[in-house]
Amino acid sequence: MSIDARAEIMARIRAALTSHERDEHVVTPAMEGVSMTADGATTEELSGRFARELAAVGGEAIVLVEAGDAALARSVADRVARFDYRAVAVQRDDFALGAAVGIPAARLMQLSGASIYRLEQADCAIVAAESLIANTGSAVVHVTAYEDRLLPYLPPACIIVACVSDLKAGLDEAALRAGDDERGERVFITGPSRTADIEKTVVLGAHGPGSLTVIIAAS
């Protein structure tokens, strides 16, 4: 392809993107008292869509009605007690740590300095989502420290906590605002780990958690 042809193609792409951006900047009047997202969906519609998509791939979404940190902590503690998780590893994130305050100390695992062998003994991980993508039932989790990066993979169960305000319709709305000096990585989690062999036999948990629950806190 010649340089002139490549330049013409790039010019057409820029023109199309500019036109698309103008269309996106058209603001539709919002209904009074109803929280709406950029695509015009209410938060209730997005949470329902997210729950359906997550259920379709074997995960579970719990959308809390009661607002407040205490309600979230209570829901997380109830989940841990219900499934009798006894070695819970919590991401060193303020929101995740706050959600885990109701878990008895005897059930919590010390994460700092933990080896891979030690983390393999955890039966549940608790991590915080930066964004939830309703169209795919995916959670975007930002992890920084070495031990935190292992949490979405090693424990057989994973609980993801998020705020209803973190719900986005699609990836283009997700808050992926990485700074130049930002450390770590972002992990996209869509349901429990699913692996299929040549005979299409699906195995859960082979390369990640076999159980995934997303608890969405009310505003």
What do the predicted segments below correspond to?
Residues 1-219:
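The feature marks the mature, well-folded catalytic cores of soluble enzymes
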